[in-house]
Amino acid sequence: MNTATGVIALLVLATVIGCIEAEDTREDFQGGFESYDGEAAEKIFRRAPVCTRTDQPCPYNEDCCSGSCTLKKNENGNLVKRCD
């Protein structure tokens, strides 16, 4: 067995052991994160609102933090929509 095969075997073994241990903390996939207390689960799934910053290309007006897009010339002289 060469080094690469050994490393792959160890990764597979670690994955299998990790899955077995994970089953102990969750009853089923529908229950998701029942074993986490409320605050920890909120930290996992908390996401900041995503918006496009000023002078970045924008396909839609609602993606801009400012809420509006205008056509502006880029460095090549082409007109592109950019957030205000």
UniProtKB/Swiss-Prot annotation:
Residue ranges the record assigns to the propeptide: 23-45
Gene Ontology molecular function terms on file: calcium channel inhibitor activity; toxin activity
Taxonomic lineage of the native organism: Eukaryota, Metazoa, Ecdysozoa, Arthropoda, Chelicerata
Cellular component annotations (GO), alphabetically ordered: extracellular region
Listed name of the protein: Omega-hexatoxin-Hmo1a
Entry text on domains: The presence of a 'disulfide through disulfide knot' structurally defines this protein as a knottin.
Pfam families: Omega-toxin (PF06357)
Keywords: Calcium channel impairing toxin, Cleavage on pair of basic residues, Disulfide bond, Ion channel impairing toxin, Knottin, Secreted, Signal, Toxin, Voltage-gated calcium channel impairing toxin
Compartment(s) where it occurs, according to its Swiss-Prot or TrEMBL record: Secreted
Family assignment from sequence similarity: Belongs to the neurotoxin 08 (Shiva) family. 01 (omega toxin) subfamily.
Superkingdom to which the source organism belongs: Eukaryota
Cleaved signal peptide residues: 1-22
InterPro entries found in the cross-reference section: Omega-atracotox
Principal place of residence: secreted
Cysteine disulfide partners in this protein: C51-C65, C58-C69, C64-C83
Function of the protein: Inhibits insect, but not mammalian, voltage-gated calcium channels (Cav).
Tissue: Expressed by the venom gland.
Residues of the site described as Critical for insecticidal activity: P57, N74, R82
GO biological process entries: defense response
